[in-house]
Amino acid sequence: MYILETNSFKYYLGERLLFKLPALKLHTKSRIGLIGLNGSGKTTLLELLAGIRPIPAAAKIICKTTMTILPQLKERLSKSGGETTQAYILQALKQQSGLLLADEPTNNLDMDHLLWLEKELRHYSGALILVFHDRDFLDALCNEIWALDDKQLQIYQGNYSNYQQQKIISEKTHDQAYRKYIMQKTHLETAFSAKQQQAQKAVKTTKISLSEARITGAKPYFAKKQKKLQQTGQSLLTRLDKLKQIEKRQSLPIIKMNLLSSKLWQG
């Protein structure tokens, strides 16, 4: 049973595209790990799904369950950072909503509280969307990874380790396509530039005598030659315009804060 569904839509901040979403579907057992570069829109996405940020006119978000969001920025209370974080977590967990959205809930927690949080989330009865920078949490709790990468949300089945394996294959394929695109683009640009130079030289008569250049038919010959070179150049330019552009990929941050096992990993 799906508890939350969206259509595919784009989200802008002013005139800047923040991200493009595919159609999303969450069921009761969804355990989503949301990852991405700082500023990629993770918090914004949670707020859109939670209904606390206005959605675009073309967007459609249908939620069929109760929802609680645990925000990253907490109100100031007369407690330490760890106690404040724990207080918000307890409050959110007690609501037992069908969908819990948590934005970096491990902030300010010590090791004992991290282990406690991992246990609580593991046994949480509802669905989860979690923003973490900890590989152990992502591996222990998630069955799907949402990666905000290059202004698009990519979906990977499995935990963070599964995501890494799929990502390596995807990156190799993309890098090969990017290198091929650059080679084709460079080849066409070089060929076009050469034809332009040849066309400019075609009307010059420095290598023949003035009397030869005045012979009837000489000028039409060079003009015809120039036109043919220009047509070839235009054909190359058309091919260049039709060449599918492939952008150089941006790498997501290395996740290495494995606090649960206290080991350092590099994803």
Where is each model-derived feature located?
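Coupling and communication elements adjacent to P-loop NTPase active sites across diverse families
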Residues: 1-13, 81, 166-267
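ABC ATP-binding cassette signature C-motif
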Residues: 1-174, 263-267
